[in-house]
Swiss-Prot record:
Keywords: ATP-binding, Ligase, Nucleotide-binding, Protein biosynthesis
The protein's name: Glutamyl-tRNA(Gln) amidotransferase subunit E
Catalytic activity annotation: L-glutamyl-tRNA(Gln) + L-glutamine + ATP + H2O = L-glutaminyl-tRNA(Gln) + L-glutamate + ADP + phosphate + H(+)
Source species of the chain: Methanothermobacter thermautotrophicus (strain ATCC 29096 / DSM 1053 / JCM 10044 / NBRC 100330 / Delta H) (Methanobacterium thermoautotrophicum)
Keyword check for Cytoplasm: no
InterPro entries, sorted: Asn/Gln-tRNA_amidoTrfase_suB/E, Asn/Gln-tRNA_Trfase_suB/E_cat, Asn/Gln_amidotransferase, Asn/Gln_tRNA_amidoTrase-B-like, GAD-like_sf, GAD_dom, GatB_C_1, GatB_Yqey_C_2
Matching SUPFAM superfamilies: GAD domain-like, GatB/YqeY motif, Glutamine synthetase/guanido kinase
Cellular component, GO, one term: cytoplasm
Cross-referenced Pfam families: GAD (PF02938), GatB_N (PF02934), GatB_Yqey (PF02637)
A GO BP entry: translation
Length: 619
């Protein structure tokens, strides 16, 4: 696709948890728990006006859902601050120092004062209906093969509560994550190449890994800002796989281009969205459709000029009707029906004609209907009407969720600046020059610098060095290089062997650096071969044995040279005909036999030398 032609513009937001001892505004620990909660609280949240007297549209839409929020609390992971029953404590200086470190690594200008703001969030993930956040730095940059990318802002904020499950009338959240320090890094929306977007996400991720940040599933989240000429800005939240970024961008661009084409067709047709909702239950009084017959009521709306367009595919497997259904689902229905896909689902051709007649649909009109409890169905159809009106205008500004296949799904309207207002319970925090210079003098080594150094100092390949850096294993690697052992063997053990053993079900996470030292020491003193290292480590992990005991149990301690010679002599004596026929050509097959007999108990070079000598003696 010609990105320049479509006017593609992209930006990136990365949210990363910091690895601090306590939360941002209270002393609770920053670990997650799956134990039973010590107590629960229930809240209902409502939007408030900004300082300019405006409501944020995203917050307003959430409030319309009128959900009850249940919060699970714990003695060690939560306190009255998370419950919004106690004022926040002073800002965690450890979190601010980590945030400043990250900002300096991103070439950013750190602000003089940290002012805490409230960002309105009433989806239930914050008990007070807002998230505390503050600006740490601005005006940074990163270099990529495609050019310089500006880093606009770095903010320090609270992470949200964990969404656990939905109930009949609301949502259950766990408060252990609420308040964990988080940095939000935002680039400017100037990127026009999806590969550059991926590269920036990778670089920022590597920089974050060089500082004190949490690791593991859910500790980092990437959001994409995507727009095209004649389209709209869309925020795609929850991108987990960096390799999926180009696919997500391409599919979002396709979606917006398709919506622009639909808009043009609707405007050419003079399409009109009527707000009248019809009760068409009588049309389906004798229906054989299980979905329809089990519903309390069947309501419908006529969309003039929409015929054939609701079923238009805008992303692989998703249509304009899917977009309408996503809006309707926010009001509690499981889906919608529309005439572009009917007859289907047990609905007959005759019933479709009756439906069209009941709402007065002409040729060129479409009908959308919902089967549900009456009030819920009405609310759902109001959302369909709203989304249909947007379709006539073009592409709506939205926050969307990234799906595993690269598609995106509507979440809520794009937030506005009306969601921000000052936090009055927390004083400003001055970032003194002494603090800034102290952090600057002790900046960590960047991942790219670390990779180049271990390649240079230890003779590692780029692949091995990259794996050690990516998996944060450089410190362990350098600690093990005290032994006179090939550094490639040590690097391979850490980067590949342990990961393979973990996948096979071996409990290698229970092995510490001291246990690995003992295993490598056996290799250094010549008691085992490098080929035996994998099996010995697996045995140590599974049975809790010391390295030498594991080697002895597996019969993998190296044989003396005279013992190796005796075994090779037997192999040669048993294959004299082959040696007579092939000469030194028998070396390969006999080497295979020898290594099979001596597997793990002899160094391959020693076996090769002795076997060669024995064959030559017979020629």
């Amino acid at each position: 696709m010609d990105w320049e032609k479509v006017g593609l513009k992209m930006g990136l937001e990365i949210h990363q948890q910091l690895d601090t001892e306590s939360k941002l505004f209270c002393p609770c620990r920053t670990e997650l728990t799956d134990s039973e909660p010590d107590h629960d609280i229930v809240r209902n949240l409502r939007p408030t006006q900004s300082e300019l007297g405006k409501f944020d549209r995203a917050a307003f839409e959430e409030a319309m859902r009128k959900l009850h929020f249940h919060y699970e609390n714990y003695h060690e992971e939560t306190c009255l601050v998370e419950a919004d029953e106690e004022p926040p404590h002073p800002l965690n200086p450890e979190a601010l120092e980590i945030a400043v470190t990250i900002a300096l690594l991103l070439n950013m200008r750190v602000v003089d004062e940290f002012h805490t703001m409230r960002k309105q969030v009433i989806d239930g993930s914050n008990t007070g209906g807002f998230q505390r956040t503050g600006l740490v730095a601005t005006d940074g940059h990163l270099e990529t093969p495609q050019g310089t990318v500006k880093i606009e802002n770095l903010c320090l904020e609270e992470d949200a509560a964990r969404r656990i499950r939905e109930t009949g009338d609301g949502v259950v959240f766990r408060l252990d994550r609420l308040g964990i320090p988080l940095v939000e890094i935002t680039t400017d929306p100037s990127m026009s190449d999806p590969q550059q977007l991926r590269e920036v996400a990778y670089q920022i991720g590597q920089i974050l890994r060089s500082t004190r940040v949490k690791r593991g599933l859910g500790t980092i989240r990437q959001d994409l800002n995507i727009s095209i000429r004649d389209g709209a800005r869309v925020e795609v939240k929850g991108v987990q796989d960096l390799d999926l970024i180009p696919e997500i961008v391409e599919r979002e661009v396709k979606r917006q281009l398709s919506l622009v084409e639909i808009r043009d067709t609707l405007q050419e047709r003079g399409a009109v969205v009527e707000d009248k909702i019809f009760d068409v239950s009588e049309v389906f009084a004798d229906t054989e459709s299980r979905i329809i017959s089990s519903a309390e009521s069947v309501l419908a709306v006529k969309l003039r000029g929409f015929d054939g367009l609701i079923g238009v595919e805008i992303q692989p497997g998703r249509r304009l009707g899917t977009e309408m259904a996503d809006y309707a689902k926010k009001r509690g229905v499981s889906g919608i029906f529309h005439t572009d896909e009917l007859p289907a689902y047990g609905i007959t051709e005759e019933e479709v004609r009756g439906l069209r007649d009941a709402v007065g649909a002409s040729q060129g009109d479409a009908v959308v209907m919902v089967a549900h409890e009456r009030v819920t169905a009405e609310n759902a159809l109001r959302e369909v009407i709203r989304r249909a009106e947007m379709a006539i205008q073009g592409v709506p500004e939205e926050t969307r969720k990234a799906l595993p296949d690269g598609n995106t799904q509507y979440l809520r309207p794009l937030p506005t600046s009306s969601r921000m207002y000052l936090e009055t319970d927390i004083p400003l925090f001055r970032i003194e020059d002494d603090l800034l210079e102290g952090i600057r003098r002790n900046l960590p080594e960047l991942p790219s610098e670390k990779k180049e150094r271990i390649m240079r100092d230890y003779g590692l390949s780029e692949d091995l060095a990259s794996q050690l850096v990516k998996r944060n294993l450089v410190d362990e690697f350098e600690a093990l290089t005290e032994f006179r052992v090939d550094t490639t063997v040590i690097a391979s053990l850490l980067a590949y062997t342990l990961r393979e053993l973990r996948r096979e079900g071996h409990d290698v996470d229970g092995l510490g650096l001291d246990e690995l030292r003992d295993a490598i020491k056996l290799l250094e003193v010549g008691k085992i071969s490098k080929d035996a290292l994998r099996d010995i480590v697996a045995c140590m992990a599974d049975e809790g044995l010391a390295a030498e005991d594991a080697a002895r149990k597996l019969n993998l301690l190296l044989l003396a040279e005279d013992e190796i010679e005796s075994i090779i002599q037997e192999i040669v004596e048993g294959n004299l005909d082959m040696i007579s026929e092939r000469g030194m050509g028998a070396m390969g097959p006999l080497m295979g036999q020898a290594m099979g007999r001596l597997r793990g108990r002899a160094d391959g070079k020693v076996v090769n030398r002795i076997l060669r000598e024995k064959i030559q003696e017979r020629l």
